[in-house]
Design a protein with these regions (language model features):
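Secretory/organelle targeting and membrane-embedding segments
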Residues: 1-172, 176-512
Length: 512
């Protein structure tokens, strides 16, 4: 196993450190839905970037499955174009030439038995030609309605069978159902064919460096964890804001909405990592156990009308351009009640967090694209300074910036230079891009590599998915019975009702 040395090596890394990077063993990846946007913009470039970093085995194989009437060479050209346009690392001909050796394409529809037999033959051929050892991951980059038929076809044609020390794995993209009942049905279908340790549910947020850094920040340092509790924390705000509209996703988005699309998975996972107890170790079972405890302890306020807000973007100005509202978007029903903004207040019934509200919000066409977790601390119980000295002093906060500008900011009060005592907020800032010269890998690079390695640390388990739906389902049911979403102009930070929700608690949203 050759040691791979990254170009632009990290100056903070000890040159005497002889730990090898984790490199996948003999294996291949089959992508269903290989002609879609996700495959072209994320999956294919991530595979190339892993190969470019020396983290894939020499005989790695990539198989595309779709309806297109393509030869292997046509598929290779599509991958080539996607890599050239979207890859994070520079294009190198020698890496490409090695990767192309293991590329194959299988033409067919999901209900085509002959196509799945051809897929089985292709995998057997690659085992001989590329030495993949029977180890294949099946990536279902397909609409949820197609999951059951693809899973059943894999079973019917013995593609899910693990023999002679080889492995087979299923990779599933969100949404994992649209409510608890459908999630349970989907899980039953998947687990009829694949055991739980063979199933990898992709939440790409968990592949981001800054999300993993939540655990490092909390548990590798002694200065944060002692104050990470109800005795010191006033409240927590978790925000995922987008400045774009729905684009061409009307067919997917309408009827799903912001809460199902983002809160059920991304934001509740961020809440779990922020609030969980320290795991016994950093292995998948220990992490999942602590996340499940937190999600199981989440409680909804009794009055959902006052503790939740949904909104829909109206026409407005975004980045200096006039943009249309959600109901004017192509393909959207003019009477649609789908939420493009959602804000909820949650509490966690355990000793660490009792009485501390967690405010989650997400939305499209907001002020800017940003994802952050803000842990906001209580004010000092006593201040020796007079009120004029501290009138501009806010609350201390630790803000974890997930995207963009990945990093951490600590906000605290400091004396303003001068003859009088005046205290204002200042910030201490850590930015990934400045402290580490190696650029962070894309989330899909990390996640695909983990699938090939069989490392399920960063993948939500069945229980986490179902617990998340148990939290969201009552909110969705309440919204279904009570009127329409509040309107908010594009380019703003959401409906005024969301500001009023926090104002009733004597708080206000952070302006990221």
């Amino acid at each position: 196993m050759a040691r791979h040395t990254a170009t632009g090596a990290n100056p903070l890394r000890d040159p005497a450190d002889r730990r090898l990077p984790r490199i996948a063993g003999p294996s291949g990846l089959v992508i269903f839905g290989v002609t879609g946007d996700l495959s072209r913009k994320k999956l294919m470039p991530a595979v190339y970037d892993l190969a470019n970093r020396g983290l894939l085995p020499p005989g790695f194989s990539l198989v595309g499955f779709a309806r297109r009437d393509w030869e292997h060479e046509d598929f290779a050209q599509v991958v080539h174009d996607a890599v050239k346009e979207h890859a994070r690392t520079p294009f190198r001909e020698e890496v490409w030439q090695q990767l192309i050796q293991g590329m194959r394409f299988v033409q067919g529809t999901f209900d085509d038995d002959d196509a799945f037999e051809r897929l089985r033959g292709t995998i057997e051929e690659l085992d001989k030609a590329q030495g993949t050892g029977g180890n294949f991951a099946f990536y279902l980059s397909v609409p949820p309605k197609s999951f059951p038929v693809v899973i059943q076809q894999l079973k019917k044609h013995r593609l899910a069978d693990q023999t002679d020390g080889s492995w087979r794995r299923a990779v599933i993209e969100k949404p994992f159902g649209h409510d608890l009942k459908s999630a349970e049905e989907l899980n039953a279908i998947v687990h009829e064919v694949f055991a739980s340790e063979q199933v990898f549910r992709i939440d790409h947020y968990l592949g981001k460096e800054t999300v993993q850094n939540i655990l490092a920040l909390r548990f590798a340092n002694t200065m944060f964890e002692p104050i990470w509790n109800r005795s010191f924390v006033d409240h927590v705000q978790i925000t995922m804001a987008e400045d774009i509209g729905i684009g061409g996703r009307a067919g997917y988005y309408d009827g799903i909405g912001a809460a199902r699309d983002v809160i059920q998975n991304h934001l509740l996972q961020l809440l779990a990592l922020t609030a969980m107890e320290e795991p016994a170790s950093f292995d998948a079972d220990a992490l999942a156990a602590e996340k499940e405890k937190v999600l199981g302890a989440v409680r909804l306020p009794k009055d959902l009308g006052r503790a939740t807000v949904r909104g829909q973007y109206a026409a407005g100005w975004q980045g200096g351009e006039k943009v249309i509202g959600y109901l004017e978007e192509e393909g959207i029903d003019k009477k649609s009640k789908t939420d493009t903004y959602a804000a909820v207040k949650l509490e966690i019934d355990n000793r660490r967090w009792a009485g501390v509200p967690f405010y989650l919000r997400t939305g499209k066409r907001l002020g800017r694209r940003v994802t952050e977790i803000a842990v906001v601390f209580q004010r000092a119980p006593h201040s020796p300074f007079d009120t004029t000295a501290t009138e501009e002093l806010g609350q201390n906060a630790i803000v974890i910036r997930v995207q963009p500008d990945e990093g951490v900011t600590v906000r605290f009060g400091s004396k303003v230079p001068g003859t009088s005592m005046e205290i204002r907020d200042v910030s201490m800032d850590f930015a990934y891009g400045e402290s580490f010269t190696e650029s962070s890998p894309e989330a899909y690079e990390r996640l695909i590599l983990d699938v090939l390695l069989g490392d399920s640390n960063l993948f939500p388990r069945t229980e986490e998915v179902e617990l998340s739906w148990k939290i969201l389902d009552p909110i969705e049911a309440h919204w279904d019975k009570h009127g329409k979403p509040a309107q908010y102009p594009s380019g703003t930070w959401g409906p005024v009702e969301a500001d009023e929700m926090l104002a009733r608690d004597g708080r206000s949203w952070r302006r990221p």
